[in-house]
Amino acid sequence: MTQIYLIRHGQASFGTANYDQLSDKGQAQAHALGRYLKNLLQTKPYIVTGSMQRHQQTAQLALSEFTIEMSMYSSELWNEFNHHEVLTAYEPKLADVEFLGQQLAQCSEPREYLKTIFYPAMQQWSEHNNHGEYQETWLQFKARVQQALYELCSQIQRHQPKEVLVFSSGGVISVVVAHLLGLSAERTFALNWEIANTSVTMLKWQNEQLNLHSFNEYHYLKDNQADLTTWL
């Protein structure tokens, strides 16, 4: 049996010119994650990351809490969809990073404001399965994630690790879970919205079958510091 831990990256720099880097809080989350994993893991894990900066930063900071060197395998298949493209296709004003930053600064509940954009933007994306507006369609994104999962299972068969860490993003993790449970696009979007930064979703690979064991665990963040838990 192999336990697979799907990990969402730490808080990135949403609303800034370079989203794809961890915020100070995201870095603190990654270190807390590393301390949690150090106590959780029983063996030296097989490690996979997406190729995005936030994936690799999260992995590097988390693994810095360990006392042994560990190598990582990187694959673009585990990268997030282009959220900027999806959001701006729905609301063109969001192409201006300063506009988005101003909107968020004016909101007492920024996450609730983004929710009013996120769901219709994702719905629009899922209904447009041609290359007219999007470089990657919803169906292509799902197929890519399923390919990532297939290749991971092949690597597990080859290397026979007991534990695997995958550092990726909320959209990817939600598609994996939805694929295993047979969920609709709408339910997938709802899962994505609830996945916390540096949360851990656990799968079990046994007898050539993959099953969901737990979803979106981030209790260890609360144990470290009350305000470390974030979703944006």
Which residues make up each language-model segment?
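Active-site metal-binding loops of divalent metal-dependent hydrolases
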Residues: 10, 170-171, 216-219
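Short glycine/proline- and acidic residue-enriched helix-loop micro-motifs
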Residues: 100-140
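Acidic, low-complexity terminal tails and accessory targeting/binding regions
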Residues: 2, 64, 68, 80-109, ...
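Generic beta-sheet signal
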Residues: 4, 45, 162-168
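Phosphate-coordination/substrate-recognition cap region in phosphate-metabolizing enzymes
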Residues: 34-116
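Short, well-ordered beta-to-alpha junction loops that form the rim of enzyme active sites
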Residues: 51-52, 77, 164-171
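Loop-to-helix element that buttresses phosphate recognition and phosphoryl-transfer chemistry
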Residues: 3-6, 10-65, 137-145
